[in-house]
Amino acid sequence: MATDSASCEPDLSRTPGDTEGATAEAAKKEFDVDTLSKSELRMLLSVMEGELEARDLVIEALRARRKEVFIQERYGRFNLNDPFLALQRDYEAGPGDKEKPVCTNPLSILEAVMAHCRKMQERMSAQLVAAESRQKKLEMEKLQLQALEQEHKKLAAHLEEERGKNKHVVLMLVKECKQLSGKVVEEAQKLEEVMAQLEEEKKKTSELEEQLSAEKQRSSGMEAQLEKQLSEFDTEREQLRAKLSREEAHTTDLKEEIDKMKKMMEQMKKGSDGKPGLSLPRKTKDKRLASISVATEGPVTRSVACQTDVVTESTDPVKKLPLTVPIKPSTGSPLVPTNTKGNVGPSALLIRPGIDRQSSHSDLGPSPPTALPSSANRIEENGPSTGNAPDLSNSTPSTPSSTAPAAAQTPGTAPQNHSQAPTVHSLHSPCANTHPGLNPRIQAARFRFQGNANDPDQNGNNTQSPPSRDVSPTSRDNLVAKQLARNTVTQALSRFTSPQAGASSRLGVSPGGDAGTCPPVGRTGLKTPGAARVDRGNPPPIPPKKPGLSQTPSPPHPQLRASNAGAKVDNKIVASPPSTLPQGTKVVNEENVPKSSSPQLPPKPSIDLTVAPAGCPVSALATSQVGAWPAGTPGLNQPACSDSSLVIPATVAFCSSINPVSASSRSPGASDSLLVAASGWSPSLTPLLMSGGPAPLAGRPTLLQQAAAQGNVTLLSMLLNEEGLDINYSCEDGHSALYSAAKNGHTDCVRLLLNAEARVDAADKNGFTPLCVAAAQGHFECIELLTAYNANINHSAAGGQTPLYLACKNGNKECIKLLLEAGTDRSIKTRDGWTPIHAAVDTGNVDSLKLLMYHRVRAHGNSLSSEEPKSGLFSLNGGESPTGPSKPVVPADLINHADKEGWTAAHIAASKGFKNCLEVLCRHGGLEPERRDKCNRTVHDVATDDCKHLLENLNALKIPLRISVGEIQPSNDVSDDFECEHTICTLNIRKQTSWEDFSKAVSQALTNHFQAISSDGWWSLEDGTFNNATDSCIGLGTSSIRSIMLGSMPWSTGQSFSQSPWDFLKKKKVEQVLALLSGPQEGCLSSVTYASMIPLQMLQNYLRLVEQYHNVIFHGPEGSLQDYIANQLALCMKYRQMAAGFPCEIVRAEVDSGFSKEQLVDVFIRNACLIPVKQFPVKKKIIVILENLEKSSLSELLGDFLAPLENRSTESPCTFQKGNGTSECYYFHENCFLVGTIAKACLQGSDLLVQQHFRWVQLRWDCEPIQGLLQRFLRRKVVSKFRGQLPAPCDPVCKIVDWALSVWRQLNSCLARLGTPEALLGPKYFLSCPVVPGHAQATVKWMSKLWNAVIAPRVQEAILSRASMNKQPGTGQTASKKYPSQGQQAVVRAALSILLNKAVLHGCPLPRAELDQQIADFKGGSFPLSIVSSYSKKKVESGAWRKVNTSPRKKPGHFSSPTWNKPDPKREGMRNKTIPHLNTNRNSSLSKQQSLENDLSVTLTLDHRLSLGSDDEADLVKELQSMCSSKSESDISKIADSRDDLRKFDSSRTNPGTSAPLNLRTPVPQKEASPPSSRQTAECSNSKSKTEMGVSSVKSFLPVPRSKVAQCSQNTKRNSSSSNTRQLEINNNSKEENWTLDKHEQVEKPNK
């Protein structure tokens, strides 16, 4: 085709010429060009030019098309990548001779082709990129399409379900519509009937209104008449009341006499109980000691481990020696490690002195003395019991039937390691004390033959002395109670979780407790923690070979665990953590025992006993819920002979007898040898066998080791002075003399050996150096010596254990600290991948872990100030301490390091339930709690319940929940004491918390808070006590909340957002959740209730009274919040009226002494309360508040307004004169409200005329709402101070708050009795009581300032006012107030002193010494009160005092007092002449107090220089005396130390004329007015001893007949229960008998 197109090219080029010629010929034929005009020629030319241009365009198009066709057909079939091949082919197949070639130059063709190829390549690449982008879009669209299709299918299915549901709903709705339509028709018919009835009722009401208006007019007239009659009745009523009170008092006296006689008869029958009462604590103490000894007896172990077998009690008298071991536990580790849970090792349980065994039976009941059962019967349900083996101290040979099977066992005990800190001076060696007179070789023979039957016992308990008894009752009781509870549960669990083990596979007894450090344990039980932990239910089982409990020596406090040798869980033998002190026991069947790899003493030559030296291999049993090292692993302990590889070796502490004379015996672990016994030491075979020392016939090097092991400094120094002695000689196990001395903690021996240049780093066959074994045993003084001699502190034993690792396993804080200060490496790992942190966590020792994490060391080795944080800094709930915890020094990699099984330290702590350790680890910022072990388990998966809760709260947001009352309107009353916001709790928001949970938590917290602050006691907010109640007793609940603010965003309960609460609060950085209470702005009073602690229902009632009666006056003692209540009610009314569409205005007017009636008229007129008669009433609501009305006369100020206020209409106008002299008629309209406040307890005189025209609201201090207001207010302040938590009732803050509350109540109670109602105080002054945790002195100082500034001046003014009531009115009374007489001053000072001691200082929780320092700050506290009685003798016949209060009275409290005056000289011969202060006799016995009560009679003397000027003064004196002696008030021994202080006073008849003004008060109920009883006060005070409480309860001032004084004094305790008081109405020096119905002589009971 290319050839054809090429051949056609000339023809195409000639075609235009031929066409043009043909056109010209045709033109010539048609017309002549010459004949054409010029215009025609131009047209012809233009046509021809157009044709030429068209031809050129056609030619160009054809050429381009030809070129494309040519290239496509010539080269389209070939690869364009090789153009030379195409050129060569075209050239060879070129055109023939007749055809003209297209191009003679191939290079030009190549260039053209290349240029074309470049353009095509660019175009193709662009198209390829576009195609790829389109392909990607297409793929994405396909994926989206698939997702949409799936979603469409789901939605379609859901739609079908919804359609089905909707159909069902529609059908139901249709049915309901039909039903409702029928109901609508019925309701319409009923409505018509009701409307008809309503019309009839309206007609009836209109008629009733007319009748009521008429009745109202009649009733107003009748009320006026009734008020007049009431005023007349008042006087008569008070007279009758006084008469009734006298009769009641006399009746009460007679009842008391009967009660006392009955009680005295009962007491006479029972005899004097004083001495038995004193001995009671001792008896109790003895019982406690007995129970402590029971905790370590064989029968206890039997009951726990065996539960079926009976232990034969030995009767050997030699074995009943008492044992006393002083204890000084190491401070580095807890007495009872956390994972032992109070279990006692068999050593502690079995070897006991006989006297303890007796006490055990006395406490637990008799045990039948049967023989020990055979081994076949000793396979108990809980595995082999250590309690069944005969006690070594009771070494009577057992029956043959039990001997042979026991010998067949393969028990083993780990090398006994004792690391008791240096204070056990005398320890019991039961074997040595068994037969002290026998030859040592005979004892050895007995030991051997007896041993076969006692293998488990010997191996575990051979020389174990029993735990010392702690005589401290506090620690004893707490420990016994806690461990008894734990062990009861553990025992029950172990019975069902421990599989049975045959006698053939029984192992040796597990390590027991250290005799020197074992705390007293009560009725301990066996513990198999692995059973409880492994069977937790976590998905995979705990992996084997877990180094959970190491094969290293344990802390100086032994792990108290009586391990069951046969108890296995998932083929894992559980064993206790390693114990202490190196003594060894040899196993009978050693063919099954692997070689020991622990630090041990040299072997004992050729005495084949059941007990071998510490150098011999001994198997041990250990407990671990995680796993164990392989049995062959070298370590400080030897695995038990068991078919299971999961055995954890442990060590048992054996204590040998050491002569206390030796000063070098720093540790009880040393033992005696025959050689040493010859030199004066007490001989003991068992310690010799156990100590690892050689026999007397051994060589010198072995003797050197024995001396070092025993701590015999004298023998050691003698041997070191010999020439040629190898001090570095090692026995077969590699134990050198330095090793033995360091292992036993003999510091002097270590020092001697080091000075003699012994090798400091000589290791045994397992690689343990003396430093290693000293760290393992907790001998920090040896560590200090060894490090000073450059011992290798980073030496690793065969298993990789470093001294620091071993010290952490031991838990000795001092050892760890010394090693850290020496610069040891904390990151060295053992062969199993454990670090020292693993070891510290495995033992549950928090102090060790803190030291590892926080102890910093300077470069030169000296430690910085210890930066280990206190325990309080690690409370996840409490947040950081004020100073902040220090930064840990260990890196995150070390904290998160995992062992071979993938377990980190956090895994170990969580699986064992060591919450404190886990908490410390969680404080490290780099901890990874999600790290998984080889079984794919996280820390949370293996954690106990407590630890799971801790981990769940690890990342919880702690946001305070606060409650706000909004803005508090400023007023004169207590607005400064009210806070706007209060913290009620802290919300823990976890990641999984939902909005529903969040809503419930907020609602529950608010409900609990309202309940807690309004309850009677100090309840915890977490208590379930309030969960059932919806509203508190103050009326607040969740419905009182207006809205809740999450930071700045409003939220309502039940509302949810797309984010979870945790994400939402963290993203918004919410710092607090604020609950806003509904307030007056919303027309509610909830915020007012919360701010003032006045119950909501009472506030709503007050509001109803104001709205209904329009004229209301609030009155009560000063400080009763009258002004605050009035202002808040006015605000609430204002916003309510405004919400209803009425304008409202509040007008406040403060009344003072110069406020006149004209000013009040001006206020009323100016604010449109008084409207001219001609003017129409306004729609505006006006609330007028008149404050401080007590400063003016009510009758003068409001007298002219009474009628217009009562009848508000134009029919009752009132004419008032203006300032310009003109007068006009006004009236009060219905939209005016008048609210007044009076700071006065009661009205007097002419003010009573105003009473009937107003609605009065009395705020009494002894009734709600004022009675409980202060208690609720202070409790809320405490809650806010403690950030939402209520402290315990015994907390000093609670005590000081209760004291402040009791001061207010007792003050008012005493002032009411004194007849001075004007001095009563409302709670306002006490609202500012400071609540400072830990600083009770601040509250006492505040109280002294309040006393000096407010209370004392008011009391002084009130008493002077009463004392001058009968004097001339006017100037005389004023003068008496300004210049009181000497007698009045004495009365005032006496009253202040009595009030201070009875009401203020009584019950103060401060210690006596601190309180004595604070007393000086109170005015009037040091008044000699003997003058109070001075006027009684002068006024015997005056008859001027009245009985003020007859309310029931409570028992007196107890308080020490200043001095009283001389005793009665007439009775000095019969009784003691003086009485010491009660506070000097506080610790005396009760019998001594009772004897004093019989002997002492000190009466008040008279000061004749002081005279009282009126009968009222005498009345005050007698009332003060009555208060001194009254049981209704708190006892003030400060005032009434004398026994017969009131005996000389007379009482005369009441003067009605003078008593009338005083009798306006009503009696105060006992429950509200009286202070707490002495027993309650004593229980709340930490500073009072038991004896003091007993003495305070004996106080009584009741007069009794003379003949029964002795009986009363003997039976004071019973008589003190009488609750009523006998006022001093009888004067035994006068024949006149007042206040009584019969005449007989009465003598006052001695004042006790």
UniProtKB/Swiss-Prot annotation:
GO (cellular component) term, any one: glutamatergic synapse
Source organism superkingdom: Eukaryota
Pfam families hit by this protein: AAA_lid_NAV1, Ank_2, CortBP2
Residue(s) carrying Phosphoserine: S1510
Molecular function terms from GO: SH3 domain binding
Chain positions found as Asymmetric dimethylarginine: R495
Signal sequence bounds: none
InterPro entries according to UniProt: Ankyrin_rpt, Ankyrin_rpt-contain_sf, Cortactin-binding_p2_N, Dendritic_Spine_Reg/Scaffold
Annotated localization: Cytoplasm, Cell cortex; Cell projection, Dendritic spine
Result when mutating P599A: Reduced CTTN-binding
Region annotation (Disordered) ranges: 1-26, 200-250, 322-439, 451-476, 492-608, 1438-1492, 1522-1648
Biased composition range(s): Polar residues: 330-342, 372-392, 492-503, 1477-1492, 1548-1557, 1571-1584
Comp. bias regions, Basic and acidic residues: 200-218, 225-250, 1528-1547, 1630-1648
Protein name (Swiss-Prot/TrEMBL): Cortactin-binding protein 2
